[in-house]
Amino acid sequence: MASGSNGRYILLISVHGLIRSHELELGRDADTGGQTKYVVDLARALGERDDVDRVDLVTRRLVDSSVSDDYAQPLESLSGKADIVRIDAGPEEYIPKEQLWDHLDSLTDNLVNWLNEQPRM
């Protein structure tokens, strides 16, 4: 995750969890509609800008046999300057967004820890 020193660093957060770079599961359930496609497309487009050094799209990491192993990978490239970053928060399995409220503190704590490990922070 190399970054320059003059461009913008953009952090996008989408807590739903079923976010990946390819074969989006649009319509799988109520949580996999247009937002998942929008945030992936937005991260890619921002990563193409000359004034942007790096874009991280943060979501929940899922280790769940009912979903693809892709969602268990902590890091996935979207483009040269854009990545999906998966952070542990709450249970490992996929849960509907309405059940995520109790786990947002965990997501925040783990995200802050991850950010503090990054070279530019």
Name every feature range the model reports, one short phrase each.
Residues 2-20, 32, 41, 45-120:
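A conserved catalytic-core segment of Leloir-type glycosyltransferases
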